[in-house]
Amino acid sequence: MTFKLGLLSFWSLWHGIVLLTNLCEGLKVVRVLPARWTFASKNYDAIVRATEKYHPAPWIPRLLFSGVLIWQFLILVGFGWAMVASVQSGWMDLEHVSIAFGLSLSLLAAFIIVDELCTEYDTEHGHILFFIAQLVTVIALAVLPRG
């Protein structure tokens, strides 16, 4: 259980950091945080650059970024729920774990599709690696023995 809980904790922490850096990025965009603030993801600018070839309305990148923030918040809630349920039950609560990883993998799948649509192949490579790493983790959590 300790190894599995460690894997779940790692991905929970990683998702928390990702959400926090994206929140800081969003706060920079709306000028709540100063432009010199360094703890920010730069993902909003990446969305603007990736979509500019399609000449979207100015509000489209903000809507996309806001949607990602909401999705990432739900992922973090899912991982928190999976952690609490697993600790309380004394073993991996695979139902809650599956929900958390399902939310995360679905966001990564959406990123991969959008990367392809926007021909952002370098970015897509990173998303594919995260997708594979999370898929391997969820399989390990399901297949490895309880002990």
Predicted regions and their residues:
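Short alpha-helical interface elements
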Residues: 31-34, 38-48, 58, 89-92, ...
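Select transmembrane alpha-helical segments in multipass membrane proteins
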Residues: 55-64
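Extended, low-polarity transmembrane helix blocks
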Residues: 1-21, 63-70, 74-147
